[in-house]
């Protein structure tokens, strides 16, 4: 009240001097900064104007309620005077600056640019108040005429009056919020200094909002508010009171309120459209007869009782506002978690679909000594296997075969030439379950499938309805099932043609369509590895030459026999066996001193080829028909690296070798 009296005194002084109050106030601040009048700021003036507008609105609403009560008792109809505009409303009109006064201010440069901008914004607020006053007068005239007509009217006319009164309330609240928005914008720009004891009404609802958003907000709220108020007014559950605004728009404010001054405008639009789409008996906070307000969970028999509960228990108060803020924080946390999960999923998909350019570090392979210890506990019939390691192997699906081990590991032979390791054809393990289980992975990721060309060709033919395919159909199956074969077509297609022509299990049949390829299963099974032919003393000779003696179990002897199928009796006792023993002994002794990751990659293009000991070890057995004579496991020390390209018909190019 002291601020209001001081403001009125300042306004009176300004009117007597013939200058606007805001300009006079600024002059006093600049000339007499030490006087008590400098405490009166523009925020005080705006707060006083808002207080006056609020009093006017309350007086008008009280008069309207009295008129409505008089309308209910017809005996006192003649005694009710007409509604008039209070005098306090007319007192605010002379504060508008005339064009002549504005020109004088600009010529004399009385105000600084910031003060001039503040003055203009204040004048805009005053113009809005004048428009509201004119609206008051029109509404009062219309209400007075309608009250006279309602004495002989019907209930339908009373509904229209209630709707107009509701519109009047909304216009009043809209003007108040616009004024408050101007004040907050001035505060952000540093043009106003709000004292701690000064209150900012509707601060949490309007902070961070621009006038366009505010108009859109009230446009949406008004539509839903009019619908709700019409239904509630018809049932007679509530009256019109400015001090207790309607729960419907305030609920929307709570749901889309501000957290730390940030207003979510797109959520408001989405919520408004969602509420419009709901059926008359559905509500986002109502489901299966239970109130979904956080912490409520009250049970209701019908939708109308839920609406009563929502309007009464969850109206705008401190508790509901706090619950709404908590819910907003929960939603924000969930959105952050969702964003993190989406980013993680995108990274996973990118990693799986894009082939890595850097080789991944592979797990430390087991050396020969550890395999000897493992082979003692393993069954003698289980052959040692190894899953090929490629740069993309860590992303490939791991089958049970990945848990087996190799006797001669890539690390232990890092200085040895190309090593071919395949498990599907050698150990009679079908590739159908693996392809079916990891079909989507092979179709999308550029990962080299761990199968031989012969196995893939056989699988393609067996999957066909007629168990026969043309060469072009085989090509199409490769590109359809494996993303790896959608590039470098010239390389792998040449390898497919070599396998079809060299393996006896693939039979070429001429028919009406042309030449088709079929599979001879009996011949395909003959390609399985054979036991070492010749004297059984070969195994004993091998492990005694290596120097391990009785440390090698029977299972390891069988493993050695499996991994050296090309060794025949012709090579027994030859000097090459002693050379093999010395080389393997040297490599085994130095295997623990270095773990070169490049050695784990068996591709010829990535394996180091030193000047000495170019040894090519091939585990896959080849048919005797494919060679001109018996081949020894170990070649000469100066063996050419091109040996594999001439001998290995399954892979035409070393860089595209199937692992």
Swiss-Prot record:
Please give the residue ranges the record annotates as the region Disordered.
1-41, 229-263, 379-413, 590-659
Q: Which GO cellular component does the record give, naming just one?
A: nucleus
| CDD domains the record matches | FH_FOXP2
Q: Return the annotated DNA-binding positions.
A: 448-538
Q: Where is the composition biased (Low complexity)?
A: 387-404
- GO BP, one annotated term: regulation of transcription by RNA polymerase II
A single Pfam family it belongs to is FOXP-CC
> Region CTBP1-binding: what ranges?
365-369
Ranges of compositional bias, category Polar residues: 1-16, 32-41, 595-605
Q: Basic and acidic residues compositional bias: what residue ranges?
A: 641-659
> From what superkingdom does this record's organism come?
Eukaryota
Span list, region Leucine-zipper: 331-352
Record function comment: Transcriptional repressor.
Q: Tell what the record comments on domains.
A: The leucine-zipper is required for dimerization and transcriptional repression.
| UniProt-recorded name of the protein | Forkhead box protein P1-B
Q: Which gene encodes it?
A: foxp1b
């Amino acid at each position: 009240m002291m601020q209001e009296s001081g403001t009125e005194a300042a306004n009176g002084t300004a009117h007597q001097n013939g200058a606007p109050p805001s300009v006079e106030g600024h002059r006093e601040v600049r000339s007499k900064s030490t006087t008590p009048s400098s405490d009166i700021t523009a925020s005080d003036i705006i707060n006083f104007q808002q207080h006056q507008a609020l009093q006017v609105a309350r007086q008008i609403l009280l008069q309207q309620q009295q008129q409505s009560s008089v309308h209910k008792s017809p005996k006192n109809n003649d005694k009710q005077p007409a509604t008039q505009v209070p005098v306090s409303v007319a007192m605010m009109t002379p504060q508008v600056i005339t064009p002549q006064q504005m020109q004088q201010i600009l010529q004399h440069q009385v105000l600084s640019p910031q003060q001039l901008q503040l003055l203009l914004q204040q004048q805009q607020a005053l113009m809005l108040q004048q428009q509201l006053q004119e609206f008051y007068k029109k509404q009062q005239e219309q209400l007075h005429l309608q009250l006279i007509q309602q004495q002989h009217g019907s209930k339908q006319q009373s509904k229209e009056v209630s709707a107009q009164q509701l519109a009047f309330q909304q216009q009043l609240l809209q003007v108040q919020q616009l004024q408050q928005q101007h004040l907050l914008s001035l505060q952000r720009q540093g043009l106003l200094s709000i004292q701690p004891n000064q209150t900012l009404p509707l601060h949490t609802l309007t902070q961070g909002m621009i006038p366009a958003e505010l108009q859109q907000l009230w446009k949406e709220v008004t539509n839903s508010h009019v619908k709700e108020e019409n239904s509630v007014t018809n049932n007679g559950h509530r009256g019109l009171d400015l001090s207790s605004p309607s729960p419907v728009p305030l609920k929307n404010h709570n749901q889309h309120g501000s957290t730390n001054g940030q207003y979510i405008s797109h959520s408001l639009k989405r919520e408004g459209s969602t509420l419009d789409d709901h059926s008359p008996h559905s509500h986002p906070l109502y489901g299966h007869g239970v109130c979904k307000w956080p912490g409520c969970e009250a049970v209701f028999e019908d939708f109308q009782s839920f609406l009563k509960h929502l309007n009464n228990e969850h109206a705008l108060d401190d508790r509901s506002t706090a619950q709404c803020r908590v819910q907003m924080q929960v939603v924000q946390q969930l959105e952050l978690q969702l964003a993190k999960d989406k980013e993680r999923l995108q990274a996973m998909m990118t990693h799986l679909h894009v082939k890595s350019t850097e080789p991944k570090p592979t797990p430390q392979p087991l050396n020969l000594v550890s395999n000897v210890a493992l082979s003692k506990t393993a069954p003698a019939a289980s052959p040692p296997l190894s899953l090929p390691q490629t740069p993309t192997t860590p992303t490939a699906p791991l089958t049970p075969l990945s848990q087996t081990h190799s006797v001669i590991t890539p690390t232990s032979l890092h200085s040895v030439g190309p090593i071919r390791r395949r498990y599907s054809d050698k150990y009679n393990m079908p590739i159908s379950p693996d392809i079916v289980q990891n079909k989507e992975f092979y179709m999308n990721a550029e990962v080299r499938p761990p199968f031989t060309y012969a196995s893939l060709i056989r699988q393609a033919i067996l999957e066909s309805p007629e168990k026969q395919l043309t060469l072009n159909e085989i090509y199409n199956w490769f590109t359809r099932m494996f993303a790896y074969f959608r590039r470098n077509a010239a390389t792998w297609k040449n390898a497919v043609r070599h396998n079809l022509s060299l393996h006896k299990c693939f039979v070429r049949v001429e028919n009406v369509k042309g030449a088709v390829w079929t599979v001879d299963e009996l011949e395909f099974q003959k390609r399985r590895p054979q036991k070492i032919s010749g004297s059984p003393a070969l195994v004993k000779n091998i492990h005694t030459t290596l120097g391990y003696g009785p440390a090698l179990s029977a299972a390891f002897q069988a493993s050695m026999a499996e991994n050296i199928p090309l060794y025949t009796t012709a090579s027994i006792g030859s000097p090459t066996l002693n050379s093999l023993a010395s080389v393997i002994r040297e490599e085994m002794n130095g295997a623990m001193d270095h773990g070169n990751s490049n050695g784990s990659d068996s591709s010829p293009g990535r394996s180091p080829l030193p000047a000495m000991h170019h040894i090519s070890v091939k585990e896959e057995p080849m048919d005797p028909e494919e060679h001109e004579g018996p081949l020894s496991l170990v070649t000469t020390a100066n063996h050419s690296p091109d040996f594999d390209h001439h001998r290995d018909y399954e892979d035409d190019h070393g860089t595209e070798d199937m692992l």
